[in-house]
Amino acid sequence: MTALAHASARCVGFKATVAGGASRVTTTRGTGTRGATRTRGTPARAMFAGFEKMLKGDPAEKTQKRYQARVDAVNALAATTKALSDEELRAKTVEFRERLARGATVDDLLVEAFAVVREAADRVLGLRPFDVQLIGGMILHEGQIAEMRTGEGKTLVSALPAYLNALSGKGVHVVTVNDYLARRDAEWIGQIHKFLGLSCGLIQAGMTEEERRVGYGSDVTYVTNSELGFDYLRDNLAQSTGELVQRDFNFCIIDEVDSILIDEARTPLIISGMADKPSERYIQAAKIADAFEKDYHYKVDEKQKSVLLSEEGYEAAEDLLQVTDLYDPRTQWALYLINAIKAKELQKRDVNYIVRGQEIIIVDEFSGRTMQGRRWSDGLHQAVEAKEGVTIQNETVTIASVTYQAFFKSYPKLGGMTGTAETEITEFSNIYELEVAVVPTNRPVSREDSTDVVFRSETGKWNAVRKEISRMHKKGRPVLVGTTSVERSEQIAELLDEDGIPYELLNAKPENVERESEIVAQSGRKRAVTIATNMAGRGTDILLGGNAEFMARLRVRESLMQRIVQPEDGEIAFEKKGNLAKAGANKWAVKDGLYPCELSDATAKMLSDAVNTACSVWGERSLEALEAEERLSFACEKGPSDDEAILALRAVFNAIEVEYKEYTNAEKKEVLELGGLHVIGTERHESRRVDNQLRGRSGRQGDPGSTRYFLSLEDNLFRIFGGDRIQALMSAFRVEDMPIESGMLTNSLDEAQKKVERYFYDIRKQLFDYDQVLNSQREKVYFERRRALTATREDLQEQMLEYAELTIDDIVNANIDASEPATEWPLEGLVGKLRQYCYYFGEIDESDLRPVAEKGGINALRDFLVEKGQDAYNRKCQEVDAVESDLMMEAERFFILSQTDNLWKEHLQAIKFVQQAVGLRGYAQKDPLIEYKLEGFNLYTEMMAQIRRNVIYSVYMFQPQRPEQETELVGAGAEKENSRKK
C-alpha cells in the first residue's frame, strides 16, 4: 500500500475506531500539546498539496517567469541611470511626457520609467527596489492584484506604477486604510515623486475644499478609501462647480486591497441627514426583548445573523404593546422588536462593540479596531443603545450612498496590493474583474506552520494555550497571541496573571488603543508576550529584538508632549494650585522597561535641547494633542523641512535610534537563535485569509518563526457551520484536556471554514448583484446632475427644451388614448392639464387642438404642443432675464440640482424598501433579483419623469423680484451653502 493510500485508510478508519469506543487520542505530558504536531492524516494532506503544486505549478514561479524579461531590461539600464546627474534624472520626466504627447504609450515607457524610479529611490531614500518589487510594480501597472508577503516592501512598490501612470497628467490615487498611513506614504514615498518633478498631494480628514482640490489636482494623491469615497459623494451633491474637488478618475492603487474590497464590501459609504424617530419605542422594544425567552418567543439563526418571532412571540408582543398588527406600517413595531432581539442575541458587548461613556462604538471584526463615527443602520444601533441604557441618538435618512464595490469599479484601471489575496481569487475575478498574481519573496520563507491542535471543549483549549505561552516564554521567544474579540483577549490575560507571566494587551479598549505603537514596538523582543485582537490592518511589522525606530519616536514623544501640548481643564486647575505632580507630568510616559537602554549623556542633552527649541519656535504648551502628534510624525520621517524645531527633533530622533539599534540588533540575534516570533491562534476566523494574516506576522523577510492554532469544537465557526461530522466528534470524545487527532477532523475543519467563506462570498455577490441595479441608476442620475452643474447657458437651454418635450409627451400619453378616434379624444381635459403645467398654455383652447388632432393624429398633436412649449420657454427666458442678466440660467441650474437631490433621496428609501420586500417573493417561485430589477426600473423611470416635470413646472412658476429685493432663489440657495457635510 502506498503512503498516500495508507494515510487515507487511517483517515477512513477513524470513525469505526470511535464507534468501537476507543477514541484515538495522543496523551501528552507537560504542555498538553506535544503530540499534536504529529496529527494523523497530515502526511496525506502534505502529499495532496505536493501533487497539486506539481500539477498547477508554483504561482510565484509562474509570475517570475512571466516578468523576468522586463526585469532584466530594467536591470540592464542600471549603469546608465546611475551615471545621470540629479538634474538629468529629473529631466527624464519631461522627456517621457513629451514622448507620450508624440504618441507613445505608458507601456512603451515602462522599462525606462521603472529604472528611473529605482535610481531616484536609491538617491532619495537609500532604498533600491529589489527585482521582486519591480515585478510587483509591473503587476499593479497592468491593473492586477499583487500578493506580497508581510515585510516585502509593498509601500515602495507602489511608487513604480504611480510614477509611470502619473506621466499622462491624469492623476493617480494611492489608497490606504487610515490617515496615518496616507500621510506617512505621502511624506516618505512622495519624496521620490517630487525629486522627479511630479507633484504629490495628500488628503486628510478635516481638510478644506481648497486643500482637497489641490490634493486631487496633484500628479499622485495619497488618500484613505473613506475620504476618497465621501469626496465623490459630496462632489455629487455640489451646488456649484466651485465646490467640486475631484477630477475624472484615471488609475488607482489600493494598499491592503482585500481589507477594502472584501472586508468593507458590505459597508456602504453614506451621507445622511437627521430624521426624527421616537426613542421611547426602542426602549419599550428592549424591555420586551429582555423578557422574551429564546426558542420559545423567537428563534435565532446565527449563520444568517437573523431572528424570527414565533407565534407565541407575536401574540405576546401584540398583547404587551396593545396593538392588533405588529407589521402595521404606521407604527412598524415589528422592526423595533426584531432589532431589539438582534441587539440582545447577536450584538455582544466587548465583541461587536464597546461602550464608552454614553456612546456605542462598533468594533471592526477584521482588524479589532474601534470604528469611531460608524453606526449600524436601520435602527439597529439605536436598539443596542436602548439595550445598554445609553442616550439614544436620532435615526438618519440617506441622502447619498455608494458601496466600495461600485465606487472602485468606476476607475478605468485599478490595481491592489496585499499579503493575502490568493484565497479570494474567485471574488476578485468575478466581482472586480481583477486577477491575482503571487509575487515571489526576496528571501525564502523559513516559518514553520504547525498542525492545528483541536480539543473537544474550550476549557481544554485555553489550558493548552496557557501552557504553550508558558513554554515559549521560558525559552525566551517572543509570543503573539491572536484572539477574535476583546472578551477573549481579556480571558487569556486573566490566565497569564494567575501564572505571573508579564504581557501586553492590544484590543479595542481605549486605554489599550492609545498604547498601540508602544505595544507593537516591543512585541518582537525577547520573552515578550502580546495578546492582540485580530492583527489584520494593524499596518505595522513586528521586528525581532524590538523596533528601535518606534522606541526612539516614543522616547522623543515622552519628552516633547508634556512641554508642547495644551493642558486640559483638569491640568490647568492643578497647575493654578501649584500641584504640578498632578498636572499631567507623566501623561505621556511609557511603561517601565520599554526602552532597551539609557541614553548617553550627549544624546540626553541633545534631546533636552531639541525640546527647548520646539518650545521656543512653537510656544510652550501651545499645540493641541493631534497637531503635536502630526508634527512629531513628520519630524520622525524624511520629508523636507526648513522648520528649526522639526530639524532639531529629527536629529535627536536619529541619534536615539542609532543607540537603541545597538541593543535591538544584539537582541535580534538572540531571538533568531531561539526560533523567532511564535504566533498562537486561538480560533479560526470566518476567512482563511485573516488566519493567514496572523500567521504572516511571523517569518518576516526570511526570519525564522513558527505558528500554531489551538481550536475547540465549541468555537463559533465549527458550532455554527461544522455540520454532522463535527457534532459526531463532540459526542464521541469525553476527554477535555487531550487534543483530538484525525485526518477526517482536520478535513472537516477545513471544509467548515471553506463553507463559511463560500457563504459570505455568496452574500457579498448577492449584494453586488442588487447594488449593480442601483449603481447603474446612480451613474445616470449623477451624469445628468453633473451635466446641469457644468452646463453653459446654451447647454442648459438644450437640456430644458429636452425636459419640456418629454414632459409634454408624458401629459399627452396620460390624457389621450391614441387607439381611439381623434374625434373622441378629451382635448378639453388635456388643455386643462397643460394650463396647470404652464400658464402660457392659457392662450390655447380645445378649438386650437381639435383640427390638428383630427388632421394629423397623435404625432401632429405632439409636434404642435412641443412647438408651443418651446415658444413658452423662450418667452419665459426673456421675462426672467429682463429682471437680471443670466438669472434664468441660475434658476434652471438650481431647480435641476434641488429636484434631483430631493427625489433621489426619496428614491433611495423606496428602493431599499423594495429590496427588503422582494425577498419574500422567492416563496412564490419568483426570482427576487429579477423582481427587484423590474420594480427598481419602474421606480427609476418614474423618478426621472418626476424630476423633469418638477423642474419645468418650477421654471414656469418662477416669478423673480426686482434686484433691490431678495429673491426666493437666493434664499433657497443660501440653505444649500453647507450641503458638503457628511
Regions found by a protein language model. Give the residues of each.
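Intrinsically disordered, low-complexity segments enriched in Ser/Pro/Gly/Ala and basic residues
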Residues: 7-10, 22, 36, 364, ...
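Generic anion/oxyanion-binding catalytic loop in active/binding sites
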Residues: 27, 78, 454, 770, ...
